[in-house]
Amino acid sequence: EKLLDAYDSGEKFFLYTGCGPSGPIHLGHYSVWSFVKWLQDKFDVELWFQFTDDEKFLYKNITYEEIQEWTKQNMLDVAALGFNPSKTHFLIDTKHAGIIYPEAIKVAKKITFSTIKSSFGFTDSNNIGSIFYTAMQTVPIFLPNILNNKDEYCLIPLAVDQDPHFRISRDVIGKLGHKKPAIIHAKFMSPLTGAVGKASSSNSSKTILMTDSPKEVKSKINKYAFSGGQDTVEEHRKKGGNVDVDVACQWLKYFEHDDKKLAEIYE
């Protein structure tokens, strides 16, 4: 509400979202980023897009070199979505550490290890880099204001799994003299195999990738899409699937803009 009130009174805001570059882009990514693009087009605002290559190196069993290759590929993938090139800025954590790190240590000084442990369930076996990472993800909330000598609100559309980071960010950011960000949570897009969980590029055979051909998409849906069907083929043909868990129906909620048509399909 504060952000919208500020916007209504003539103030600008900027968008911040991101990507952990460790694999190919899939339909779940697109469902969030297409909304980000809509926001940018609708409000004509700047977008700061963070590629958290450090996060993926610290959290996943993948080499630094592999992550850099995925960073390059994912940058091309994001650019292909059609964001306004004159108002879209890419931040790569390792490449732009020179401007991110000085602010990250200011954030880190306000976050206790106890807070990180309780938020993420860390133990003594976690590497110290992963403990620090939340500070890096916090910086783009206010970095554009520092670089441009402004005091604008930040709006963050994000997947719900990123919420623990930004809960911490919101708790400490006021202590540094910056405005708390506004956050819009996006639901996980159901995986092909069922309504529980999220789409993931780690299992590309059962995930719709943005690089898949129409033939590959059709094959994956026919082979893996969960329908919540009846006990027998005959009953399924008569009664159909369970629309509350049917993956195709869940996906149509994201991509079918006509609510009337969607209701007819559900019937």
Regions found by a protein language model. Name each.
Residues 22, 99-102, 111-267:
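Active-site cores that bind ATP or allylic diphosphates and position pyrophosphate for catalysis
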Residues 1-14, 21-143:
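N-terminal Rossmann-like or analogous alpha/beta NTP/dinucleotide-binding catalytic cores
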Residues 14-17, 156:
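Short hydrophobic beta-strand segments
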